[in-house]
Structure formats: structure tokens, C-alpha cells
Amino acid sequence: MLLEHVTITLLNNTSFALLPEAYAPFDPLIDVLPIIPLLFLLLAFVWQASVKFR
């Protein structure tokens, strides 16, 4: 029952946390920030491909 409520709540919200009103202009940036570590992971593969996986 509780799990269903949490799942429905998360699916209804576009973001998991709401920023205070003063930080509303930064909302698109906050949505992108979790992707940055994945970009570093991809960069490691591109780097290794450029040196032929030595």
C-alpha cells in the first residue's frame, strides 16, 4: 500500500525534489547535473580508444 503510494507520487512528479522558489531558474541545470559523472565515464572510454586501449 505504501509502496504503491510512493510509486504513484514519484510518477506524478517530474522531479524528485522541489527547489525553493528563489532557485527556480536553476531547475533545468539541477535536472542535468546527475548526468555529469556518466560523461566522465564515457570520456574514459573515448580516451582509451584514442590511445588504442594500451
Swiss-Prot record:
<dbReference type="Pfam" id="PF02533">
    <property type="entry name" value="PsbK"/>
</dbReference>
<dbReference type="GO" id="GO:0009539">
    <property type="term" value="C:photosystem II reaction center"/>
</dbReference>
<comment type="subunit">
    <text>PSII is composed of 1 copy each of membrane proteins PsbA, PsbB, PsbC, PsbD, PsbE, PsbF, PsbH, PsbI, PsbJ, PsbK, PsbL, PsbM, PsbT, PsbY, PsbZ, Psb30/Ycf12, at least 3 peripheral proteins of the oxygen-evolving complex and a large number of cofactors. It forms dimeric complexes.</text>
</comment>
<keyword id="KW-0150">Chloroplast</keyword>
<comment type="similarity">
    <text>Belongs to the PsbK family.</text>
</comment>
<keyword id="KW-0674">Reaction center</keyword>
<keyword id="KW-0604">Photosystem II</keyword>
<keyword id="KW-0472">Membrane</keyword>
<dbReference type="GO" id="GO:0015979">
    <property type="term" value="P:photosynthesis"/>
</dbReference>
<keyword id="KW-0793">Thylakoid</keyword>
<feature type="propeptide">
    <location>
        <begin position="1"/>
        <end position="17"/>
    </location>
</feature>
<dbReference type="InterPro" id="IPR037270">
    <property type="entry name" value="PSII_PsbK_sf"/>
</dbReference>
<protein>
    <recommendedName>
        <fullName>Photosystem II reaction center protein K</fullName>
    </recommendedName>
</protein>
<feature type="transmembrane region" description="Helical">
    <location>
        <begin position="29"/>
        <end position="49"/>
    </location>
</feature>
<keyword id="KW-1133">Transmembrane helix</keyword>
<dbReference type="InterPro" id="IPR003687">
    <property type="entry name" value="PSII_PsbK"/>
</dbReference>
<keyword id="KW-0934">Plastid</keyword>
<comment type="function">
    <text>One of the components of the core complex of photosystem II (PSII). PSII is a light-driven water:plastoquinone oxidoreductase that uses light energy to abstract electrons from H(2)O, generating O(2) and a proton gradient subsequently used for ATP formation. It consists of a core antenna complex that captures photons, and an electron transfer chain that converts photonic excitation into a charge separation.</text>
</comment>
<dbReference type="GO" id="GO:0009535">
    <property type="term" value="C:chloroplast thylakoid membrane"/>
</dbReference>
<keyword id="KW-0812">Transmembrane</keyword>
<keyword id="KW-0602">Photosynthesis</keyword>
